[in-house]
Structure formats: structure tokens, C-alpha cells
Design a protein with these regions (language model features):
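A broadly used, surface-exposed interaction patch
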Residues: 55-78
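Generic structural signal for short, solvent-exposed loop/turn connectors between secondary structure elements
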Residues: 13, 20, 63-65, 109-110
């Protein structure tokens, strides 16, 4: 089941340890389990944008990776969902990223 954030339809969440990044640009959301969220029991803890999901070390070398793992008991409990934006500019992606951060106020976007 895909997830929608502010009318942007993100992919179905996948455990971050099982994720295979595509060669594309877009937005991503890092999620953690939350029994009170619906329709899926996951809540956003970080929104970001990238020019290439498949960039070497994209997840583990991210400056906020340690913050994400501190939010969950095990890193296996981290999920990722993406919103593909092929052909987009960094400016376009950052505008949507800023909008989503303002609306959802995830704990790891500071």
C-alpha cells in the first residue's frame, strides 16, 4: 500500500535494510513504527530529497542516519518510501521537501 503525504503519493514503505534504491531523483521519507498512525502503522521521522537514490552509500552515509537509528529500537524497524521525480530540479524537490517538513514536523528534520 502506497503512502500519501500532502497529496504526494509515495511508494509502499520498505524496511530500510531490504531497500534497493532506483537510479532516479526524488523525495524520500524515513518512517518508524507507530501503532496510532493510519492507514499504515508508520509515522514520518525525516523527509529528504536526492538527485540519485542509487548514489553510493546513500542511506548509511547520510548525516542523519544516526538520528534515525536512535529513534527506533533496531535499525531493522526503519522504513523508507519514495516519491519519484525524474527530470526534476533540486529547487523543485527542495520546495516540496520544505512543504512536507512544515506540515508533518518530523523529529529528525531540524
Amino acid at each position: 500500500m502506497n503512502m500519501t503525504f500532502d497529496n504526494y503519493e509515495f511508494s509502499e514503505p520498505v524496511k530500510i535494510t531490504k531497500w534497493e534504491p532506483p537510479e532516479s531523483r526524488g523525495l524520500y521519507v524515513i518512517l518508524e513504527p507507530d501503532l496510532y498512525s493510519s492507514p499504515l502503522p508508520l509515522k514520518p521521522i525525516y523527509f529528504g530529497q536526492t538527485g540519485n537514490f542509487a548514489e553510493r552509500g546513500f542511506i548509511k552515509s547520510h548525516e542523519k542516519y544516526k538520528d534515525w537509528t536512535r529513534e527506533v529500537v533496531k535499525k531493522e524497524h526503519l522504513f523508507i518510501a519514495i516519491y519519484l521525480m525524474p527530470g526534476s530540479t533540486e529547487e523543485e524537490r527542495k520546495a516540496i521537501e520544505t512543504e512536507l517538513i512544515a506540515k508533518y514536523q518530523p523529529v529528525c528534520n531540524d
